[in-house]
Amino acid sequence: FEVYWNVPTLQCRAVYKMIFKLNRTYGIQXNA
C-alpha cells in the first residue's frame, strides 16, 4: 500500500522539477 502511493509521488516530484526548470528557463525569456 505504501509503495502504491510512493510511486505516483516520485513521478509528481520529477514532473514538478521539470516544469520548474522549464518555467525558470523559458519564463525569464518570455518575460524579457
Curated annotation (Swiss-Prot):
<comment type="function">
    <text>Hydrolyzes high molecular weight hyaluronic acid to produce small oligosaccharides.</text>
</comment>
<dbReference type="GO" id="GO:0004415">
    <property type="term" value="F:hyalurononglucosaminidase activity"/>
</dbReference>
<keyword id="KW-0326">Glycosidase</keyword>
<dbReference type="GO" id="GO:0005576">
    <property type="term" value="C:extracellular region"/>
</dbReference>
<keyword id="KW-1015">Disulfide bond</keyword>
<feature type="glycosylation site" description="N-linked (GlcNAc...) asparagine">
    <location>
        <position position="23"/>
    </location>
</feature>
<keyword id="KW-0378">Hydrolase</keyword>
<comment type="similarity">
    <text>Belongs to the glycosyl hydrolase 56 family.</text>
</comment>
<keyword id="KW-0964">Secreted</keyword>
<protein>
    <recommendedName>
        <fullName>Hyaluronidase-Pk1a</fullName>
        <ecNumber>3.2.1.35</ecNumber>
    </recommendedName>
</protein>
<keyword id="KW-0325">Glycoprotein</keyword>
